[in-house]
């Protein structure tokens, strides 16, 4: 299966880096099935970035959590990760809480909106996907195929 990643530099050998803030599925290396989404990730750096392609081969011995859709379990998992609580999964896959959804997640986590209000606000205009790798063993499922520079067409 082909996965994409967008960044500001070539990432031939992915790593799990601790960022300044917790992401949807906690610290990890994030990819997507969607080419256009990876392009948006790459272009967030001043309109120029690197688009990567990886070959992903699943390993049945790894602990994987997959959310097919935005569900109550997905919301609770993201809130827990965004609050800085680690999990025991090698790989987590599911929808993204994009920038707008992130604000709703944060408002829900802070008790500013109800669960029902979150779901009313959280309707996506386009589908999203992310798969995050959280252990060295999980990164072994990825093989770098290529990375190339792209520019914003605007």
Which positions does each model-derived feature cover?
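Extended catalytic/binding region for NAD+/ADP-ribose chemistry, centered on the ART fold
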Residues: 20-45
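Surface-exposed loop/turn and secondary-structure junction residues enriched for glycine/proline
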Residues: 14, 19, 28, 65, ...
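A broad, structure-centric signal for solvent-exposed, well-ordered loop/edge residues
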Residues: 11-13, 38, 63
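Conserved NAD+-utilizing ADP-ribose enzyme module
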Residues: 24, 44-154
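Short, conserved beta-strand segments within well-ordered enzyme catalytic domains
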Residues: 3-5, 30-31, 53-55
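ADP-ribose/NAD+-binding catalytic cleft of ART/PARP-like enzymes
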Residues: 1-25, 152-153
């Amino acid at each position: 299966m082909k996965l994409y990643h967008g960044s500001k530099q070539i990432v031939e050998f992915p790593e799990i880096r601790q960022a300044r803030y917790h992401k949807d599925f906690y610290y990890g290396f994030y990819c997507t099935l969607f080419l256009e989404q990876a392009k948006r990730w790459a272009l967030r750096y001043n309109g120029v970035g690197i688009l990567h392609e990886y070959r992903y081969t699943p390993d049945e011995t790894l602990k994987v959590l997959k959310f097919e859709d935005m569900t109550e379990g997905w919301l609770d998992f993201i809130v827990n990760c965004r609050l800085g609580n680690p999990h025991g999964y090698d790989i987590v896959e599911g929808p993204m809480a994009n920038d707008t959804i992130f604000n709703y997640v944060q408002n829900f986590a802070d008790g500013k909106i109800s669960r029902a209000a979150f779901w009313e606000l959280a309707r996506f205009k386009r589908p999203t996907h992310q798969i995050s790798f959280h252990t060295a063993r999980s990164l072994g499922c990825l093989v770098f195929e290529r990375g190339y520079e792209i520019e914003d067409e605007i």
